[in-house]
């Protein structure tokens, strides 16, 4: 009996030891070059845990196709440089439009800027209408037009680049109709070529995402400042004033509008401090803008205002502005209110206009984009 009890005890001890051994980790697991089922499973990537692109990411990566219609003002030179540097924008066409320049006279200078300085060789440049739709005959002062036609005496490289043979409005139509996605129009001069495009082919409005406009003054005074010849007008802004009829047609087209009027672009001063940040830049576009701003300091005897480049910013970065909505219109009848932009109480969510901006943040953003920092 004693022997049987001892044997039974030994068996219990043996089973206890074996159970402890089974609980110990396999010593081979941590040895290099030895694979076990457990270590192999640890190295397998779980595809469900991978970060995959989302539709939101894809939309963020997609650039906005933009047609830029300008009238050759100094701010347009800055605006085009900004557009070319903005990674969220794809410039698909440029129109030399009516306004501060004669579109034909300045076309070769703008071709040199577009193709030789900014290297935008794939972007077509077309000449817009040289006369407004509005029969009033109002125009910018002659001295301004002469300066604009000479690209403000800024030195440009020689260029034999061909200008698109199509009329400005026709290039707009063709680009919109052939685009796989909706187009954004940025207009910083008169609305002449946009109105002509809509007259010739009204169906293009279906492929226009939005028209972004620098023009008008809703709550602010106008900026003619007695320079409009015999016209006595304290309420109009130049871009609307010189072709109020075209502006009225665009405003009433039903296409969503984003307006940066004098209200939303006022007090955007170019200072010596801002210009100093361009100095020493190796980029050809930055060097040209630096040269232009130095000339503008001499013309204005100090700091000067820009209006068009804030409108370019509004395409991708509306957060720098305060916005209101409404039904918008333009007074096109000849008289003291010719070219005045007005807003009705009836709210139209498709239309928005800026009533103010954050000057400091806006300036920093523009320089960050232009200087690619």
How would you name each of these model-derived features?
Residues 1-11:
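Bacterial N-terminal signal peptides that target proteins for export
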Residues 19-22:
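C-terminal motif of bacterial Sec signal peptides marking the signal peptidase cleavage site
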Residues 24-26:
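Bacterial signal peptide processing site
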Residues 33-64:
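N-terminal low-complexity, Pro/Thr/Ser-rich intrinsically disordered segments
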Residues 50, 59-64, 79-91, 238-241, ...:
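Conformational coupling and interaction surfaces
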Residues 58-70, 74-112, 157-259, 265:
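Active-site histidine-anchored catalytic micro-motif
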Residues 126-159:
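Surface-exposed loop and adjacent secondary-structure segments within mature catalytic domains
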Residues 129-134, 215-218, 261-268, 334:
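Glycine-rich beta-alpha junction loops
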């Amino acid at each position: 009996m004693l022997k049987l009890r001892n044997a039974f005890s030994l068996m219990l001890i043996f089973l206890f030891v074996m159970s402890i051994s089974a609980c110990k980790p396999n010593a081979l697991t941590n040895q290099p070059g030895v694979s076990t089922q457990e270590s192999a499973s640890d190295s397998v990537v779980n595809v469900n845990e991978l970060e995959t692109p989302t539709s939101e990411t894809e939309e963020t990566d997609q650039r906005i196709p933009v047609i830029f219609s300008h009238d050759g003002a100094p701010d347009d030179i800055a605006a085009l440089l900004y557009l070319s540097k903005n990674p969220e924008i794809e410039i698909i066409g440029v129109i030399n439009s009516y306004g501060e320049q004669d579109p034909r006279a300045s076309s070769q200078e703008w071709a040199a800027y577009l193709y030789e300085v900014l290297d935008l060789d794939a972007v077509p440049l077309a000449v817009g209408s040289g006369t407004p739709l509005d029969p009033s005959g109002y125009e910018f002062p002659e001295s301004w037009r002469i300066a604009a036609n000479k690209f403000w005496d800024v030195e440009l490289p020689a260029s034999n680049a061909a200008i698109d043979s199509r009329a400005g409005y026709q290039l707009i139509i063709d680009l919109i109709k052939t685009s796989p996605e909706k187009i954004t129009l940025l207009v910083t001069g008169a609305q002449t070529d946009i109105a002509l495009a809509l007259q010739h082919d009204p169906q293009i409005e279906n492929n226009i995402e939005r028209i972004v406009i620098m023009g008008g003054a809703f709550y602010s005074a106008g900026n003619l400042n007695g320079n409009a010849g015999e016209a006595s007008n304290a309420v109009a802004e130049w871009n609307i004033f010189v072709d109020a009829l075209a502006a009225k047609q665009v405003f009433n087209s039903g296409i969503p509008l984003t307006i940066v009027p004098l209200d939303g672009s006022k007090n955007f001063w170019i200072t010596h401090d801002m210009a100093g940040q361009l100095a020493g830049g190796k980029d050809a576009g930055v060097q040209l803008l630096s040269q232009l701003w130095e000339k503008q300091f001499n013309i204005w005897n100090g700091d000067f205002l820009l209006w068009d480049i804030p409108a370019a910013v509004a395409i991708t970065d509306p957060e720098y502005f305060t916005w209101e909505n409404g039904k918008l219109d333009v007074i096109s009848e000849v008289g003291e209110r010719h070219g005045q932009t007005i807003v009705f109480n009836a709210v139209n969510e498709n239309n928005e206009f800026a009533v103010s901006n954050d000057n400091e943040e806006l300036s920093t953003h523009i320089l960050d984009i232009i200087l690619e920092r």
